C-alpha cells in the first residue's frame, strides 16, 4: 500500500509505503521531496522507517539522520541549479555526507573553441562519401557543449550543433581524448558514426557505422564496423 501526500501546490511531497503482509506489524518507509523557492526539485530523502501514515518533514529528517535511520548528516541526494532562468542543473550529489565532499556530478555549459579539448572537427557528407574537409574545425562558438564530470573526476563532453544534433561525444581518459563523431547529410540523416579508433586509423570499414537512405529518408542500407 502506498500513501502519496502532495503539498499546497499539488507537488509530490511525501510517499509512505506500507507492508501489507497479514499477521505482522505493518512496516512503513517514507520518502520526502524538497523544492527550492523556484519550485525546482532539490533534495530527495532516502526511504526512512516511520511509525505513522504521515509524519512531518522535521520528524522524518530527524529520524533519517539518527540511529534508527542512516546515522548520516546528509541522507538525501541533492540537485543544484545555475543562477539563471534556464533552470539548468550544475551539480548533483549522491546521498551521504561522504559523497557531498568533493564527489558531485558536475555539469558545465560551454561553447566550442578552435583548440584543445573544446575543439571539434568538421566532417560532412553527401550521403555516400565522408569528407574530413582537410582537418577543418568548427569555428569558435558554433557548437553548444555540455561538460560532465563524474564523481571520480572523469570528464566527458557532448557537442551539439544549431539543429540540436549531437556531432561529437568526447570521453577523457586522463589526457587521452576518446572521440565519437556523428556525421549527417544535408537532410539531417545520420550517415556515419566514427568510433574513437577512427581518429588513429581512418578506415571506415573497420571503425565506422555507415547508413544510407532513400529519397523518403528511409534507411535502406547499414554497415557495422568490421562487417564484410
Each language-model region and where it sits:
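Beta-strand elements of repeat-based all-beta scaffolds
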Residues: 1-228
